[in-house]
């Protein structure tokens, strides 16, 4: 009888949610997506708010399409029915960078009116980092 080889198992990738909002410092969110792209054990999921898209144009030379291309999966900011909005969609972590004051206040008050705040609310509820 042969022993199972633990190296034959393909471990699922760690899902990391990166949300970019309209605060200044969009370069930090872009850099995080660039770093995650180099990590073979990570699957990045991105949500970019309309204000972040505007900030992106004002603060960088990058386009929205270029930033979206850094993520494995991109979600529409308005789609509160997306997988990220469910606690049954397991993620390893969520990072909101940059995080606007509006987004921070929405999370503090559980005011989930878009996918970023809904996913953040779920992440907090589930006790995930």
Question: What is each model feature region?
Answer:
Residues 2-129:
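A cross-family phosphate/adenosyl-ligand binding-site feature
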């Amino acid at each position: 009888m042969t022993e199972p080889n633990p190296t034959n198992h393909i471990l699922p990738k760690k899902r990391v949610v990166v949300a970019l909002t309209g605060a200044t410092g969009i370069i930090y969110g872009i850099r995080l997506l660039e770093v995650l792209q180099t990590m073979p054990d990570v699957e990045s999921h991105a949500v970019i708010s309309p204000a972040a898209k505007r900030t992106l144009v004002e603060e960088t030379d990058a386009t929205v399409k270029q930033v979206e291309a850094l993520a494995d999966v991109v979600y529409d900011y308005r789609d509160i029915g997306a997988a990220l909005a469910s606690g049954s969609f397991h993620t390893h972590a969520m990072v909101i960078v940059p995080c606007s004051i509006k987004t921070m206040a929405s999370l503090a008050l559980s005011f989930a009116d878009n996918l970023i705040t809904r996913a953040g609310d779920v992440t907090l509820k589930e006790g995930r980092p």
